[in-house]
């Protein structure tokens, strides 16, 4: 009889062998629908469409996605538990490793409890459902620049929803005054970091307004986890905010280098999610992702110097862009975006950089505007020389 570990090892080896043999075919199939296909994991140097590039895209802020210890932890989880539980968490689908993710997240965020979800995209609907069930709000007020995972789900609760001008606390106050009915409490929903331009939301102002009306704030903090705050706990820590009226969720796929969503908080808020539709109606997360998440959080806590390096790289990138003539803020967010006179100009610069072996993003993502933008991201693992090369090539083209 073939042992469980032996079977999993053989199956994994076979899949890897098949994947390598079929890489060209798969790339061709995907290439018919997507312009770019990554042939290696995100790192300062990455292979795209079969060519090696200096890579300034995505959200792998610490390149944990290719860190040997993270990969080893993912492999062990896969060998121990198989690919997934093939059922929901509240049936038989809770592996011990999922509980360990939640325990580690509580430690990382300094929270009483946490719930691990299969995807970061689910954090907002899960959070909204919990807060609504607990009676924390009766009407939602959403920053119009919020991520799609907020705007896609904000009407699902069948509660009144109002949008306010992007990053504008005064408009938020006006909308609440005009629309909140007597006895109602507002929920203000926003990103912590808006992903395209890397701007940090004015959360202290949002919070003051929400508190004035006995309301609360919910943040999609996917881009801030690991990046902002002394301990990498995100936007609230960055601003020094603490209150039982502040709630958030995030992803483990960016700074942490794994996959899945995480909502830290007190047990009152976590319990309705643990027993709710998002958890009951979905398969549990991939075991390898859980193993990677635990190791990613451990590395984040053990190596705060990585965050300091990330901030240094962010300062170098933004200072260089300012010298070229592009307006940039002074935040430690390692994301910078800028526009040129026309979409055609941005297409040209993007193409020329690709020809010179440098990959940045030509983005039309949330908040990019009708012509889109050019966007560059630095990792903690980029060298000063690599960042200088990007800046030098960009300056020559604009």
Task: For the regions a language model picked out, list residue spans one by one.
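C-terminal segment of N-terminal export signals and the immediately downstream linker at the start
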Residues: 1, 21-47
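Conserved PLP-anchoring active-site segment centered on the Schiff-base-forming lysine
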Residues: 130-148
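Active-site C-terminal subdomain of aminotransferase-like
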Residues: 201, 213-216, 223, 228-332, ...
């Amino acid at each position: 009889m073939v042992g469980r570990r032996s079977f999993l090892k053989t199956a994994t080896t076979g899949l890897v062998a098949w994947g390598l043999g079929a890489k060209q075919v798969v790339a061709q199939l995907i290439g018919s629908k997507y312009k770019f296909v990554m042939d290696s994991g995100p790192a300062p140097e990455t292979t795209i469409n079969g060519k090696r590039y200096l890579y300034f895209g995505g959200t792998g802020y610490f390149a944990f996605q290719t860190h040997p210890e993270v990969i080893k932890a993912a492999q062990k989880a896969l060998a121990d538990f198989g690919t997934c539980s093939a059922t929901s968490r509240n049936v038989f689908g809770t592996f011990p490793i999922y509980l360990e993710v939640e325990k580690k997240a509580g430690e990382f965020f300094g929270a009483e409890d946490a719930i691990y979800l299969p995807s970061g995209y689910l954090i907002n609907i899960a959070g909204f459902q919990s807060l609504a069930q607990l009676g924390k709000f009766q009407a939602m007020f959403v920053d119009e620049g919020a991520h799609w995972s907020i705007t896609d789900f904000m009407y699902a609760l069948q509660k009144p929803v109002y949008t306010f001008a992007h990053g504008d606390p005064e408009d938020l106050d006006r909308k609440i005054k005009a629309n909140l009915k007597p006895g109602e409490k507002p929920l203000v929903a926003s990103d912590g970091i808006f992903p395209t331009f890397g701007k940090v939301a004015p959360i202290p102002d949002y919070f003051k307004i929400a508190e004035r009306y006995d309301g609360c704030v919910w943040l999609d903090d996917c881009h801030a986890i690991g990046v902002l705050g002394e301990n990498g706990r995100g936007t609230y820590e960055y601003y020094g905010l603490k209150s039982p009226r502040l709630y958030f969720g995030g992803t483990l796929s960016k700074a942490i280098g794994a996959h899945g969503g995480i909502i830290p908080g007190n047990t009152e808020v976590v319990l309705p999610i643990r027993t709710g539709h998002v958890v009951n109606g979905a398969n549990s997360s991939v075991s390898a992702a859980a193993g990677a998440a635990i190791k990613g959080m451990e590395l984040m806590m053990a190596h705060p110097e990585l965050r300091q390096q990330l901030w240094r790289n962010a300062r170098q990138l933004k200072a260089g862009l300012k010298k070229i003539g592009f307006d940039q803020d002074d935040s430690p967010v390692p994301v910078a975006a800028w526009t040129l006179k026309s979409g055609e100009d941005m297409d040209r610069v993007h193409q020329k950089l690709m020809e010179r072996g440098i990959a940045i993003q030509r983005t039309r993502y949330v908040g990019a505007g009708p012509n889109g933008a050019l966007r560059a991201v630095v990792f903690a693992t980029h060298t000063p020389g690599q960042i200088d090369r990007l800046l030098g090539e960009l300056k020559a083209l604009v």
